[in-house]
From Swiss-Prot:
Protein name: Probable translation initiation factor IF-2
Gene this protein is translated from: infB
UniProt KW keywords: GTP-binding, Initiation factor, Nucleotide-binding, Protein biosynthesis
Family: Belongs to the TRAFAC class translation factor GTPase superfamily. Classic translation factor GTPase family. IF-2 subfamily.
Matches recorded under InterPro entries: EFTU-type, P-loop_NTPase, Small_GTP-bd, T_Tr_GTP-bd_dom, TF_aIF-2_arc, TIF_IF2, TIF_IF2_dom3, TIF_IF2_dom3_sf
Gene3D superfamilies: P-loop containing nucleotide triphosphate hydrolases, Translation factors, Translation initiation factor IF- 2, domain 3
Coiled coil segments of this chain: none
GO annotations of cellular component type: cytoplasm
PANTHER family found in the cross-reference section: EUKARYOTIC TRANSLATION INITIATION FACTOR 5B, TRANSLATION INITIATION FACTOR IF-2-RELATED
Region G4: start-end pairs: 132-135
Domain tr-type G: residue ranges: 7-223
Transmembrane intervals: none
Pfam family membership, one: IF-2
Chain positions covered by the region annotation G3: 78-81
């Protein structure tokens, strides 16, 4: 076996939509070689599962492969989903070296599938796609744990045809999102094409192929990134901050470089000044054979990258998920503190003067949320990690723009004392664990609120209208004048002033009748009887005249600045015609 001593295990994250099989896949990988005492057995870490090269080769049934690979195995992050991917960040990008995007072959792409692809593309992370649940294809004959082609060749022609159709629908969806892909065994260049592996996370079919493709990708594209310093100071990323009985606040972290020992001084990233503390205990999970032992962790004196581990230390309150953990010596302490401080500052989001407030559970997910909001041109006034607090509510409440008096929370809760404030202030709070859904919910709400406010404004505003007095349709000359009119633009209502072609206001619309019935409005094309209080036909108004609804100057400004997009083409024509009249003598009228 040609494993290089200074190559660490590549870190793999499994991403995809809810219920598409992320957890089942991790369970299958975990369970595939968890046999007590077996050589090359899978090792359970804190928050991760290590599959050594020997177990992968054995699963593939080809011992000759052992000499072809230099990486020691694969380290799968146990928390599935893009949440884990964004949490596990290293300086300048994602910590995961490789990703597996899982998609249900029978359901195709869903919002989280697309979100996962976007995040991977953003971080330039190599990935494969697994088309899961092939065992659910009608008529499928399962071959437990078999490589995909072995299983595929044992299916009937009809079932193979059904799989091929569904498979190429997945390939088509990848193409629609800008990725060229094909079945993994037909891909020659993984740098430019995505390998798609049909699998069943329940029967284990295709799992050997997946592990082999991941090893190949690691070997091909990552070897230069996997070198680590076996004696150097440990560097890791916090996966989770947890309270453990008897231990207090602990950190679950992935150590991706160097060594971490009990008694080491560490610097931990937080929103304020970095935490400086000493490692009290380094903990690993007990083997499955020791599961009855009351204490589920065992203490070790040191660990070497790449490894998932729990540490206990004083003063860890305030440590950030996704934050950095670095080992420091007396000589390097100041420099390490500065480095960790800079990492957190790198993530401080560029905010706008006015905008919404966003909260997320980790630095990485905050970055992901900010990126998506920026793409949608949604301004952000404040972005922070943590649950929604009383202060967040009060700050959002103080914002004048109702569309910005909003808090968007990704994977967070509202603190108990803040819940009452949400009710009393009316601040709008959106919460979800899918970024797409959060953005859609916010946009839909804005659209709905705009429509409501436009309707309210619109109902109090005099709208543009243009109408002509039809020939031979004078029913009464005055007190009030009653004439037949045709609406040639916009909407005319009762109680609106009437202006002539030179802008003179001559009266007010008292009533409208259509086919003998009283109506309150008349729209373009309608011919109605109109009673106008004020003018006399033959003096101020005449047959054939084109008249306008007289729009007050303040209303014109609202129409032009706030409601312009909601006006129809004929309303715009009527408005332009009215403005031409009013601005003949005063070009700055209503400007």
């Amino acid at each position: 076996m040609v494993v290089k001593d200074n190559l660490r295990t590549p870190i793999v994250c499994v991403m995809g939509h809810v219920d598409h099989g992320k957890t089942s896949l991790l369970d299958m990988i975990r369970g595939s070689a968890v046999v007590s005492g077996e050589a090359g057995a899978i090792t359970q870490h804190i928050g991760a599962t290590e599959v050594p090269i020997s177990a992968i080769v054995e699963k593939c049934g080809n011992p000759g492969l052992l000499d072809k690979f230099m990486v020691p195995g694969l380290l799968f992050i146990d928390t599935p989903g893009h949440h884990a991917f964004t949490t596990l960040r290293s300086r300048g990008g994602a910590l995961a070296d490789l990703a597996v995007v899982i998609v249900d072959i029978n359901e195709g792409f869903k919002p989280q599938t697309i979100e996962s692809l976007n995040i991977l593309q953003q971080h330039k992370t190599p990935f494969v796609v697994v088309a899961n649940k092939i065992d659910k294809i009608h008529g499928w004959n399962p071959q437990k744990g078999a490589p995909f082609m072995t299983s595929y060749n044992k299916q009937s022609e009809h079932v193979r045809g059904s799989l091929d159709t569904k498979f190429y629908e997945v390939v088509g969806e990848l193409y629609n999102h800008g990725f060229s892909s094909d079945r993994y065994d037909r891909v020659n260049d993984f740098q430019h094409n995505i390998g798609v592996i049909p699998i069943s996370a329940i029967t284990g079919e295709g799992i050997p192929d997946l592990l082999m493709v991941l090893l190949g990708l690691a070997q091909r594209f990552l070897e230069s990134n996997l070198h680590y310093n076996a004696e150097g100071p440990g560097v890791g990323t916090v996966l989770e901050v947890k309270e453990e009985r008897g231990l207090g606040t602990t950190l679950d972290l992935i150590l991706y470089d160097g060594v971490l020992k009990k008694g080491d001084t560490i610097v931990v990233g937080c929103l304020g000044e970095p935490i400086q503390t000493k490692v009290r205990a380094v903990l690993k999970p007990r083997a499955l054979s020791e599961i009855n032992v009351e204490d589920k962790f065992k203490q070790v004196s040191k660990v070497t990258a790449a490894v998932g581990v729990k540490i206990s230390a004083p003063h860890l309150d305030g440590a950030l998920s996704g934050g950095s953990v670095r080992v420091a010596t007396a000589e390097t302490l100041d420099a390490v503190v500065e480095e960790v401080r800079n990492e957190i500052e790198d993530v401080q989001i560029d905010t706008d003067q006015s905008g919404i407030t966003i909260k997320a559970d980790t630095i990485g997910s905050l970055e992901a949320l900010v990126n998506e909001l920026k793409k949608e041109d949604i301004p952000i006034r404040k972005a922070n990690v943590g649950d929604i607090s009383n202060r967040d509510i009060m700050e959002a409440f103080a914002i004048e723009d109702p569309f910005h008096s909003v808090i968007v929370g990704f994977n967070v809760n509202i603190l108990p004392d803040a819940k009452e404030k949400v009710r009393s202030t009316g601040v709008k709070v959106f919460m979800n664990d899918v970024i797409y859904r959060l953005i859609d919910d916010y946009r839909d709400w804005v659209k709905e609120q705009r429509a409501i406010s436009e309707k309210a404004v619109s109902e109090t505003i005099v709208k543009p209208a243009m109408f002509t007095i039809m020939p031979d349709c004078v029913f009464r000359q005055s007190k009030p004048a009653v004439v037949g009119v045709r609406v040639i633009g916009g909407t005319i209502k009762t109680k609106v002033d009437v202006a002539t072609g030179d802008g003179t206001v001559v009266g007010i619309v008292k009533g409208l009748q259509s086919r003998g019935e009283n109506v309150s409005v008349a729209t373009i094309g309608m011919e109605v009887a109109m009673s106008i209080e004020g003018p006399t036909v033959g003096r101020q108004i005449n047959e054939g005249d084109i008249l306008h609804a007289n729009i007050p100057e303040r209303h014109v400004k609202i129409l032009e600045q706030e409601l312009y997009d909601s006006l129809s083409a004929d309303e715009l024509e009527a408005l332009d015609s009215f403005l031409d009249i009013k601005r003949r003598d005063n070009p700055f009228w209503a400007k």
